């Protein structure tokens, strides 16, 4: 299991660009940046912004993030999972033009298996559309964008997934913890078991 920081080398554009999901889209004119990133704090404070004073009086909107990287051929036997610690809000993630899914709202981490969409030994493009245009949507300043870290998790096909192992405590007080025999484990496998 290898967990790599995936925050460097992103490009950003504030505004909706419907064709930006495509791997062939030319993002060379976009701003280069490192994540985490919040585009709202780069805007002007104004009570006229749709978020209102309860949302920090900062602008919302729609933004796109893109990153190009090479997936080495010698790692094609690994499962690659793209992990987002936080994106606010209503994000959709694409790999090489294929939508992996939509994450509504934005206060929870999420992960996608990108292995089936990778081009081994070639350039790959991740595109993330973030939609925080519908304002106000919270009672405090929420930010806009990929506001937490992004990770690339590489594992073998047979592995214990993140958050897949749990330990339980039967009872606990200030002086003592009683163990329990209750255990829970999940196992990821892309292999079929035949009997």
Residue ranges and their predicted role:
Residues 43-51, 55-60, 67:
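Mid-chain, structured segments of secreted extracytoplasmic proteins
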Residues 37, 60, 192-193:
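Generic low-complexity segments that are intrinsically disordered, proline-rich and/or Lys/Arg-biased
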Residues 1-47, 51, 125-129, 133, ...:
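Accessory carbohydrate-binding/adhesion or oligomerization-edge regions at the termini
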Residues 95, 177-186:
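Beta-strand-rich binding/interaction modules
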Residues 183-195:
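Single conserved hydrophobic/aromatic residue that forms the stacking wall/gate
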Residues 54-60, 170-178:
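Short, solvent-exposed beta-strand/turn "edge" segments of beta-rich domains on protein surfaces
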Residues 4, 14-16, 60-170:
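Accessory beta-strand-rich segments of carbohydrate-active enzymes
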